Amino acid sequence: PWAGSIDVVSGGFPCQDISTAGKRAGIDGQRSGMWKHMARVVGEVRPAFVFVENSPALTFRGLGTVLGDLAEMGVDAAWGVPSAADFGAPHLRERIWIVARHPHQGDERAKRRVQDSGPDAGRVRADPSGWWATESGVGRVADGVAHRSHRFAAAGNGQVARVAAGAFTLLASRLKPNVF
């Protein structure tokens, strides 16, 4: 019932079996094996885009499975392992990111939504000083949690929102036809 009505399926399946700090069982491990359920959802929903995040160790503990499953569904994919430092953060925090899309599905709709998603949509780089500001540049005293910060909770504790946005933009631009 969801086919064609969902634009993006995004997620990071558990990495405990993939990570070098974990059990190293790979993508067929008890926890990381959740990929097969994410793949099932992608196959049933057929979103315009799929956005996946995981440990960079996925490159040798299951990336072939993920890309193969996506290819079997007729989905084009691009992947990379950017770090938070690549987007201006003062720490490394490498993650693998995969962006996939169904060819010719949602081209104009997706492009319009990304372009119209707000004034910060195209900003991926941090302040040129190399450090991200903790206070607003408006010249007032902070009196609580920043506006819209609750949205970042959906990304998880280990994610840097600018990296996710930058990875999506970079990888989606590699797919044909080019969305950006």
Task: Kindly label every feature range from the protein language model.
Residues 1-8, 15-161, 178-179:
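Class I S-adenosyl-L-methionine
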Residues 168-179:
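Short, hydrophobic alpha-helical segments
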